[in-house]
From Swiss-Prot:
Source organism of this protein record: Solibacter usitatus (strain Ellin6076)
Protein name: Large ribosomal subunit protein uL30
Keyword Ribosomal protein in annotation: yes
Pfam families the record matches: Ribosomal_L30
GO cellular component, one term: cytosolic large ribosomal subunit
């Protein structure tokens, strides 16, 4: 879809700071290997940049 990004949680947020866990929850991710589609806006891009060690942008 145009204007959407697919985000995959490929590492568990266990043993990460609470702030990072809240970012994962804010993106709507709950399980490892779960993929969600979100609008390609600066808000969601910024959330992905905060925790690149946990997330992957899937094309």
């Amino acid at each position: 879809m145009e204007g959407m990004i697919r985000i995959k949680l490929y590492r568990s947020p266990i043993c990460t700071p609470d702030k990072q866990k809240r970012v994962v929850k804010g993106l709507g991710l709950r399980k490892v290997n779960q993929i969600v589609e979100r609008p390609d806006t600066p808000v969601f891009r910024g959330m992905v940049k905060k925790i690149p060690h946990l997330l992957m942008v899937v094309e």
